[in-house]
Amino acid sequence: MEQYYLVLLAFLGVIAVIDLFVGVSNDAVNFLNSALGCRISSFRTTLWVASIGVLAGATFSSGMMEIARSGVFHPQLFTFSELMIVFFAVMVADVILLDAFNSLGLPTSTTVSIVFELMGAAFAAALFKLIDAGAPLSDVADYINSSKSLGIVSGILISVVVAFISGAVVQYLARLVFTFKFEKAYRRIGAIYGGIALTAIIYFLVMKGAKGASFMRPEWIQWINANTAVILFSLFTGLTVLFQVLITVFRVNIFKIIILAGTFSLAFAFAGNDLVKFVGVPLAAWDSWKEWQASGAADNAFMMGGLLKPSTAPTAFLLLSGFVMVLTLWFSKKAHRVIQTSINLSSSRSGTQEQFGASAPGRMIVRGAMGLGKVISQIIPMPMQRGIASRFEPLPVVKGEIPLPFDYVRASINLIVSAILIASATSLKLPLSTTYVTFMVAMGSSFADGAWDRESAVYRISGVLTVISGWFLTALSASSLAAVVAVLVFWGGEAAAIILGFGAIFLLVRSNLKTREDDVTLSDESRSVYDAASFSRSTCRRASPKRSGCSRASMRTSRPTVSASLRRSRRAPPTSSRTP
């Protein structure tokens, strides 16, 4: 049996690498869509910033693995052989499920998937244990940490609603202040806006990212908690003064600083806190094997109470995992497809091919929203409506230019609101999914920005409903698939484990090595979302430097400026006047 468990551990190690690949392919949308959608920098520059954030987060990660070890079930009630089957079922189900979502281009929560897979597999193991012992099946609740699952479900509901409303409200207020012709407002209050934005991003970086890092001492964390208000005010004041100097003296585009800093912080926090969920299960299996070897007991008699002890992943292992994540960012086509879904649903472009079709719930929501808009328009005075509509009047499209999905203002709002919500939930120890927050903030900001017009609203809402339904399907399918795999291994033994293991690897290889054109290369439309440098150069060639704001240096470096963004982020006027 020892050789069997060694083979199982080797398989779990291979699956861990694959899980990193498919997991990062889905989670990359959390920290890449804002920078890529507004083309604040080239695709390569954005990836380099995200890659550095991922490696830094992996290096400083504490690597705490409580979720995989004891966060979902009570390990002291299971034997070594039972938990090895649970860990095997979880990893097989996880890679298959995440790869399916990646193939569909739908973002989902990797945290929710791993938690409910652990729950489903542990539930199946507990049932087999109770049946063999002749105990009542109602005792299965003693084996599962049910409060964790309720916390995750409540986190899903809360994060979806709060993130959408927050993104919509903040973006609406920001657009009222800046408008689409934001160059004048940028010179007046850009420094204050930048101070608020970067303060929120740094606060998020500390609360969500660095606070759990291995180098953070307990006394440092206590000092930060005791002096949070003073730290935030000092940061805001200092950054505002710095940005005012950069804007007035050096003519620096601070939107680039804000958006790239937000991209780095989200990538850092992702690697620092979420990395271990991809490798936590194989490492928990490895720790279980070492304890079993040291005990000398039979595999079906040794109870795994040792998993209740806190454990951290080795830094070298986390850093190696970080390199795998970076390679995924650069080379995964499915990551690009998931990012494309998020950008398409929040894009200001209209009249183009929509990714999702219309649905009956989408039509009902649109009709209800239009009716509510008519009621509001009758309440608000017409002069106020005209004043608000003038603030939301988009720039006309210049012939020959390709409109961006969204501009710098909306991209920065997406990052700021996401950072504030995630950091606040982390400080309050509330369950929250970063995927749900970042996606719904982007949807709320696009709704408030008028990106969903009469032509595209029903398609965009149908797409959002598809993604949200996929989130709830994640929990059900994850627990069910892991339970089925566990049941098959309990019944079929070693032969079933070997067949399922090789079957999972075959499906993944077949899915990721397709030769069809739409799976190997990006379409022309999606490629235009990413290639900022070539777009900037082509814009400069079409217009004179004086008109386009492109100097010879900018033509060579494709370095975006605020003036250039005003000409490059244009979209068609709406078919109807804007009402609040």
Regions found by a protein language model. Give the residues of each.
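Helix-loop-helix hairpins and the membrane-proximal interhelical loops
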Residues: M1-F11, E66-I85, A210-N253, I343, ...
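Membrane-interface alpha-helices at helix entry/exit sites of multi-pass transporters
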Residues: R39-S51, G151, S295-A298, E455-V467
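Transmembrane helix-loop junctions at the membrane interface of multipass transporters and ion channels
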Residues: L127-S146, L205-I221, P282-A285, K290-P310, ...
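Core mid-bundle transmembrane helix pairs that form the ion/substrate translocation pathway
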Residues: I152-T248, I257-A261, A316-S332, S347-E354, ...
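Non-transmembrane accessory domains of multi-pass membrane transporters/channels
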Residues: R349-S390, S511-T579
